[in-house]
Amino acid sequence: MQRRWKYSCIMAILATLSVTPHLQAAEMQLPDIRTQPTPQAVLDEHIDALNKCDWNRLVAQYPEDAQIHLLNGTIITGRKAIGELFAGFCKDPKDGGLNGINFKVIQSTLIGGTFATHWVASAPFLAEPYKGSDAYITKDGLMQAMVTTFDGAALKMKK
C-alpha cells in the first residue's frame, strides 16, 4: 500500500512538473547570473541555497548551457529548465515539493573543478535520513553541471 502511495505521489509530481513549466514560463523571471570566487564557494552557495529553498540563489549559479543529470538518463539543460526544476523542488511538501529538507555534506573531494560529494538529507517530514552523492562540476565561478543520485521516490515520508 505504501509503495502504491509513493508511486502515485511520484506520478502526480511528474505530471505537475511537466505541465507547470508551461504555466509558469511566462511569469518566471530568471535571476541574474552570480559567480562565486572559488569552486568551494560555488558548492557552499548551492548547498545553503538548497537548504533554504532560495530559488533565486539556486538559479543564479547556473549559466545558460548548464546541465543537471538525473536518474534514468534524464538531463535538464539550460537555466530556464533548471529554474523550473528547482521551482518544483522548492514547493511546500503539501504541494509536492521538498521545502524544509536539509542537505548536510558528509564528505566532499575536489578534483579539478569537480566535487564528488556525499551528503545526507533530513527533514521534519521524513521518517528517516536519506543518503546520496552528487558530482558538482564548477567552471568560472558557476555550477556548470551536476550529476545526482537523488531519487525522490526513495524518500521515506512520515505517515
Locate predicted features.
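Hydrophobic pocket/interface hotspot
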Residues: 46, 58-59, 66, 78, ...
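Short beta-strand segments enriched in hydrophobic/aromatic residues
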Residues: 62-63, 121-123, 150
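Short, low-complexity N-terminal intrinsically disordered segments enriched in polar/charged residues
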Residues: 23-60, 64, 157
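Surface-exposed, charged secondary-structure patches
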Residues: 83-129
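Bacterial N-terminal signal peptides that target proteins for export
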Residues: 1-10
